[in-house]
C-alpha cells in the first residue's frame, strides 16, 4: 500500500477527527467520549511533531504528542497519541507512523515518550514494544468509562515508556 507521512495541518482536522472518532468507538483507545473541537485539541498537543499518514490523498491515521507536565524539568517528556483508521489497521501504517513520530520527536529534543494503553488493546501494546517502549506497570482502575458498553466500569491502563538514545543524553 502506498502512503505518505507528512506534518498535520489545521485543514486536516475534519479527517483527523473522523479517525479519532473511530478509535473512540472501539472503547479501547481512550477515555474520551467524544472528539474535542480543534481549539481544545490544538492547545493540548505540542505544535510539532504532529503527523498524518495519507493513503490516496485521505488521512488514514495520525500521531501527536502532548506534555505530561508543565514543569520545566519535564520539558522533554511527552505522551503519545496515535490512531489509525479501521480500514488501514494491520497494514503497517501504525508502524511507519510511530517510527516517524519517534524520529521527529528526537529531532525536536524529546527524550522520553510515554503511552497509556488499555490492556485489551494488544495491537497497540505490541506496536509500542516493537519501537522500544517498555511496560513500566499497570495503573489500576485509573479512570471510569463514561460511554459505551463499558460505561461505569473502572479501567486499568498499561503505562509504557521509551527513552531516547539520541535526545537528552548529555
What are the language-model segments listed below?
Residues 90-103, 126-130:
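Conserved acetyl-CoA-binding loop-helix of GNAT-fold acetyltransferases
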Residues 105-117:
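Conserved GNAT acetyl-CoA-binding A-motif
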Residues 33-87, 98-99, 104, 163-165:
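Acetyl-CoA-dependent GNAT
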Residues 141-170:
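C-terminal "cap" of GNAT-fold acetyltransferases
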Residues 64, 114-117, 125, 129, ...:
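Conserved catalytic-core motifs of GNAT/GCN5-like acyltransferases
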Residues 58-62, 123, 154:
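Glycine-rich acetyl-CoA-binding "A-motif" of GNAT/NAT acetyltransferases
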Residues 2-16:
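A short beta-loop-alpha structural element at the N-terminal edge
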Residues 13, 17-43:
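Conserved GNAT-fold acetyl-CoA-binding loop/helix
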Amino acid at each position: 500500500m502506498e502512503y505518505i507521512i507528512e506534518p498535520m495541518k489545521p485543514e486536516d482536522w475534519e479527517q483527523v477527527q473522523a479517525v479519532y472518532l473511530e478509535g473512540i468507538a472501539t472503547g479501547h483507545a481512550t477515555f474520551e467520549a467524544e472528539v474535542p473541537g480543534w481549539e481544545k485539541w490544538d492547545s493540548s498537543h505540542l505544535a510539532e511533531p504532529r503527523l498524518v499518514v495519507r493513503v490516496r490523498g485521505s488521512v488514514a491515521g495520525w500521531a501527536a504528542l502532548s506534555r505530561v507536565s508543565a514543569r520545566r524539568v519535564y520539558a522533554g517528556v511527552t505522551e503519545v497519541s496515535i490512531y489509525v483508521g479501521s480500514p488501514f489497521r494491520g497494514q503497517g501504517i501504525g508502524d511507519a507512523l510511530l517510527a516517524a513520530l519517534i524520529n521527529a520527536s528526537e529531532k525536536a529534543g524529546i527524550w522520553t515518550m510515554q503511552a497509556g494503553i488499555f490492556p485489551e488493546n494488544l495491537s497497540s501494546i505490541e506496536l509500542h514494544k516493537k519501537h522500544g517502549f517498555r511496560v513500566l506497570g499497570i495503573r489500576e482502575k485509573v479512570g471510569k468509562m463514561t460511554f459505551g458498553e463499558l460505561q461505569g466500569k473502572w479501567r486499568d491502563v498499561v503505562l509504557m515508556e521509551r527513552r531516547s538514545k539520541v535526545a537528552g543524553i548529555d
